């Protein structure tokens, strides 16, 4: 499988599998069963049996080496790269690249990347930035801040704080990003981090939103 571009690694007790068909590192080996069923190197009369597949899966898991640098690789190899459905955009090379096992993405984008015409870029700039913030310098700062956040140029790649007055436009722009990058980007109101004397906990109920990049 490694000859076909697959890779297996272990971190903190979890096994991660890079499958070229998916392009990212996913936990678990459940889908190995499909490969076992189709593998010509395995005995034809045994490769489809569940108990045999269970044993093979456990054996494969035991052979996977632990990588103490895995979490660091997730951060550093995806630096200045933005995940899309059809590949990742490299902000340094300024082009779309194919997913590969040397780049440790754990999530894939929900939309395809496609170069846009200048008139589309101008429309986005005028409506979502200049039209919201009203000042070219502020708009440029906000655009660059979002770009750096999406490309990993922040210490914590999970959370990016935007500070501003009510009705300043920050909600509009973050909602636009959430709609575009559905699988990676979510908005979370700062008040959800505040302690509240109630029978519920808004921060706890919304903790899944922080899982976006």
Tell me what each language-model feature is:
Residues 9, 44-52, 64-72, 137-141, ...:
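Residue-level signal for secondary-structure boundary elements
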Residues 49-88:
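Extended, Lys/Arg-enriched charged tracts that mediate electrostatic binding to polyanionic substrates
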Residues 33, 37-41, 57, 61, ...:
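Generic solvent-exposed, charged/amphipathic alpha-helical segments
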Residues 6-22, 26-30, 76, 88-211:
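P-loop NTPase catalytic core of nucleic-acid-dependent motor ATPases
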């Amino acid at each position: 499988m490694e000859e076909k571009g697959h890779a297996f690694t272990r971190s903190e007790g979890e096994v991660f599998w890079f499958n070229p068909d998916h392009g990212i590192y996913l936990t678990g080996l459940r889908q190995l069963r499909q490969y076992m069923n189709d593998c010509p190197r395995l005995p034809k009369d045994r490769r489809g049996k569940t108990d045999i597949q269970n044993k093979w899966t456990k054996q494969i898991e035991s052979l996977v080496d632990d990588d103490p640098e895995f979490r660091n690789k997730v951060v550093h190899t995806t630096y200045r790269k933005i995940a899309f459905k059809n590949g990742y955009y490299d902000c340094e090379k300024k082009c779309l690249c194919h997913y590969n096992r040397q780049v440790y993405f754990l999530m894939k984008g929900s939309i395809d990347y496609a170069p846009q015409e200048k008139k589309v870029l101008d429309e986005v700039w005028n409506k979502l930035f200049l039209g919201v913030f009203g000042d070219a310098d502020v708009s440029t700062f906000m655009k660059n801040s979002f770009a750096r956040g999406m490309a990993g140029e922040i210490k914590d790649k999970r959370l990016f704080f935007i500070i501003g007055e009510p009705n300043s436009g920050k909600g509009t722009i973050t909602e636009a990003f959430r709609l575009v990058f559905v699988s990676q980007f979510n908005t979370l109101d700062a008040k959800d981090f505040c302690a509240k004397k109630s029978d519920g906990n808004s921060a706890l109920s919304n903790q899944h939103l922080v899982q976006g990049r």
